[in-house]
Structure formats: structure tokens, C-alpha cells
Amino acid sequence: MKCQVVLILIVVIFNVCIEAETIKEDKHTLLQFVNNINHSHSLNWSPSLSICTKWTGVTCNSDHSSVDALHLAATGLRGDIELSIIARLSNLRFLILSSNNISGTFPTTLQALKNLTELKLDFNEFSGPLPSDLSSWERLQVLDLSNNRFNGSIPSSIGKLTLLHSLNLAYNKFSGEIPDLHIPGLKLLNLAHNNLTGTVPQSLQRFPLSAFVGNKVLAPVHSSLRKHTKHHNHVVLGIALSVCFAILALLAILLVIIIHNREEQRRSSKDKPSKRRKDSDPNVGEGDNKIVFFEGKNLVFDLEDLLRASAEVLGKGPFGTTYKVDLEDSATIVVKRIKEVSVPQREFEQQIENIGSIKHENVATLRGYFYSKDEKLVVYDYYEHGSLSTLLHGQKGLRDRKRLEWETRLNMVYGTARGVAHIHSQSGGKLVHGNIKSSNIFLNGKGYGCISGTGMATLMHSLPRHAVGYRAPEITDTRKGTQPSDVYSFGILIFEVLTGKSEVANLVRWVNSVVREEWTGEVFDEELLRCTQVEEEMVEMLQVGMVCTARLPEKRPNMIEVVRMVEEIRPEKLASGYRSEVSTGATTTPIGSLSGSPYIL
């Protein structure tokens, strides 16, 4: 028995000695690495400090026996760095070198890291082809090589990385055909903006077209269409018969409606010869003081009801004044009083009705409107949490100010991106928001961003000079905004969220100058710097903002691509979690409590 105890003690002591020796070797390896590279930021990698608790960007495993992760994103690394030294960290699982200026060919020596699960080399200056065989990374789950200058073909050996769930090779110079990658667990794929040709292989046709945009590849054919091709004639015949029956039924319904309407007009002309209904919708009131509602009979009221109600000025903007109105039935709404409408009544009403038809959880629902010669009003829900502008900049500098956490900022940016993407899909894919800014973003009932003010800019005179900080450089008239200019404005919004700066007029120039000097960390809001564990996510969001604010419109992604980029920052939460929490098309339910929030149109 005593011999067994002694033997166990010897084994334990032996293992402890081995572990101590491993972490000692890892420390020596990283000191050798940092002494052989060019970097503009000072790393506190000192031999006298604990590698596991004090070294910036270094994370050890649970028992501090070896280095588990290197997070060196945006640390000013530059030039052709010898990464073979890092390959000695045999237990390394995470290697993040994003947003530096590292050049040279793909570091093949990293293939010695058999335990690697995440490799991010995005936003660097790597060039040349990838190795033909990448199968040594059997445990790899995330591979991001986007925004470099890699060329050649995409290795088919990537298909052997069976645990891979995220692959991003976008914005490189890859050419040739897309390999057939049979990876069942692959959830995120981005091959956009390369020089790829041919067709999308069947194994990848489950991904959206945005994953392949910017290449010369044929769009994937939906599997259900391929399945039923041999029954084409039967399908066509069935459709033709269905259409004929539908047309006959529609004609019958129209005939009944026409006869019914004529009878109604006769009765109406007898009873009220001087009155005329504006619309057949039951929510549209008669007379000059009625507000037109798109839905919800419980909200029907007229101008006199508004004048009697208790109102509070929430904000004044270049388009008019916004009021919080408490109605007699305890309902609270937001009424925006619009000034300087530059279009005739018919065009105004047509645009407003288009906006009112939009139903999406990340787009503020337009409830109704009023138009007369002297007064133009629009009615929205009241969001008690307030606008993103208030949450970011309100009470700044005060001790009792509640900090806006990164989680909330990320959710608001993501929700807003989804909202703008949905807006861009309306009116045949031609609708433009035209006035994206932080005072038009609110928290919806699920705590995600919800955008208001859709399409209003096209109805007004051009914005004054002091209010055009979000405007894309190619836009000289805000009434003629485009979807790419919306993307630019969204990029400014991202910068505002990351920097916490309320003055956005020169924000793009300032952010680019700071990043160019390789001081990316200086960009971020001081309130965010306390959250060191999310610095990598903030850097990735910064990259999205920089792509969105490209000076040339054709260089900017569309909003569907932007949504995917933001999802990839935290895929397990955003890409899947949002859809499980929020059902598509659900209406917004205002939550929270924050008085005096500026709703500025």
C-alpha cells in the first residue's frame, strides 16, 4: 500500500515538473518571437511578469501549464514575420493575428500546430497561394483568411477539415473553380469578391448568393427545382390550369366588388352629398381632421384628439419637431410634425403608404399620417428605452451615467443592419432609407436595434450642412440617396458606436488616420476598453465599418453582406440566436424606461 502511494506521488511530481517545463518553454518561445518582429505597439511581455496572467494577448489553459491562445489583433505587427517560432507552441488552440500589416506568403510552418481550432489572419497583406494540403488541422473550426492578397486555387483539402464551421476567404484573388467541400457542420461560408469561376458545387448550394458575390460563378439552382425537372411538362400544365381558374375567380370577385361599390356610391351620394371617403380602408377617417391609419383600430383618433392630449417635445431636427403624446385612453405615441415638404400631396401619400406597408421587427412601424396644406404629421410607436444617440451620448461625463455595454451596442448594430437590409428589399429592391443616424435607432422589444424614419428624406428639402455627417461623399442631395449611400451612413453609425464620439462630420477621416498609424486600440470608446475580452469583436466590427465607408460606392458591400459580416463577429449568438428569439415579421413592442429621449426626424 505504501509503495502505491509513493508511486502515485512520484507520478504527480513528475507531471508537475513536465507542466512547469512546458510553460517555461512557451514563455521562452514567445520572448524569442517578440524580439524578432517589427511591431509599433508596446507589448508588456517581460520575463519578470507571469505569462498567464500579465502578458497582453496571451491566454493559458486552465491549469496554467501551457499557452492556449494568442490574441494579437491590431497590435501593429508588420512586415514579413517569421511565424515558425509560434509553431513551437504545441498546445496552442487559438491564433488571432487579424488587422495587422503582416506580409509574405502563407505561413506553412503553422501546420505543425495540430491542436489549432481557430486561425484568423484576416485584414493583413499576405499573398501567394495556399498550401495544397491543409488536412493536418484536423481540429480546426474557424478559418478566416479574408481581406488579404492570396491567389491561386482554393485547396480541395479544406474538405477534410470535418470540424470546420466557419470559412471566410472573401476579398482575395483566388481563381479557378470552387472545390466540392463536403463539410456537414459548416455554418458560415464567405467566398465573395475573388476571381472564382464555374458553378457553385452541390455541397455548398445551401448557402446564400451573398457568399459568392463578386465572382464569375453561376448562381446555384435550387435543389427542389432539380428534383422535379423531369416532371416539367406536368408542372407547367398544372400551373397553367391553376392560373386560369385563379383568373376566372378573380374576375368574378372583381365583378361583385364593382357592383357593390356602385350601390354604396348611390347610397352615399343620397345621404352625404358634400362628403367623400378618402379610401375604402375602414381605418381611414372622413373629413379634414382625420388621420389615416394603416392598421389597428384601437389607434383611431383625429387631429382634435391630438390637440387635446398631453404632449412633450422630445426633439427638434432639420425635418421638424417630434412629440411624445399621451392619449386619453392611456396609449402613448410619437407624432412627428414635418416641415418643408418638397413634394406634392399625391407623391407624399404614395411614399408614406409604401413605408407604412413595411412590417419587420427591426423597422419601426409607421402607424399613420395626416396631410393638409398647413400641417403634415406622421405617427409612430413610442420607444421608452430611447434612441441609440441618447444611450451613447446622454449624460456623458456624469458619475451616475449608465454605461452602454458592448453587448447592447452589438445587438443594436446587428438589428439595425437587418432592418436596413429589409428596407432595401422593398419596392422591388429599390427603396432607400436616406437618413441613417443614431437618433433614428431604437431598442425593440427584444433588445435589438430598430430603425425609424424610413424614406422620409426623399420628401424633404436637402439637409442643412451641419446635419450631413452621415452623408456619403457622392451624395450632394439627400433626396437622391442610394442604397450604397445608406451602406456608407451605416458605416459611420458603426464608427459612432465604437468610438462614442457624437461629432461624426470627420469621423471617417479620423478613424482611417488612427488605423493607418497602427494605433487601432485608440479608436475605441473608453467605456469599451474596460471589456478586454471583447476587443477582438470590436476590431472585427471596426473592419465592417471601414468596408462600408469605402469612398467608391461600388467597393461597398450591400446590406445583406453587411448583415453576414456582423453575424460572423459572434455567430453563435447573432446568426442563430436572433432567429430563435425573434420571429420574422413580428411587430415591435416598446420596452424599458428612459425619459426625455430625443426622437429627431
UniProtKB/Swiss-Prot annotation:
GO terms for molecular function: ATP binding; protein kinase activity. The chain crosses the membrane at residues 239-259. Pfam families: LRR_1, LRRNT_2, PK_Tyr_Ser-Thr. It is found in: Membrane. This is Probable inactive receptor kinase At5g53320. Disulfide bonds: none annotated. The modification Phosphothreonine is found at residues 408, 478, 549. InterPro entries: At_inactive_RLKs (IPR050994), Kinase-like_dom_sf (IPR011009), Leu-rich_rpt (IPR001611), LRR_dom_sf (IPR032675), LRR_N_plant-typ (IPR013210), Prot_kinase_dom (IPR000719), Ser-Thr/Tyr_kinase_cat_dom (IPR001245).
